[in-house]
């Protein structure tokens, strides 16, 4: 039996691809998480039925949201990543020796776990000594945080705050 993944882009356009393998399909407190494999894109992550990234193209997004701000900021030492469960932005940031601390604030612990299991080439950035991963709501984290950030990167895949934050 063939399995297909389809993502609606507009009312007139739908992207569909044949799935070779379903590696993971779980429901977290925040969203449905699927890791699938296709011939065209390799492994890819879908959240609530929408593709977040694939092995073939993740570098485009991660490099753009990381290296452009780093190129124009004169002195980055402390960075906040809002979201960042897949670790791709952290992986790019750890290449900068000037950075002393990277705080990743992600509300979905299960998403971090799924990414660690299925995308270790991305999440390796989360294991650097300068990286701290906080599993909590970003707004709540910021309200209770002392200190400043030189750079904040929004890599959120879902709402930045919950109704009780």
What positions do the PLM features span?
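The AdoMet/dcAdoMet-binding core of the Class I SAM-like
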Residues: 2-4, 28, 53-163
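A general beta-strand register signal
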Residues: 46-47
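N-terminal auxiliary segments of SAM/dcSAM-dependent transferases
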Residues: 1-39
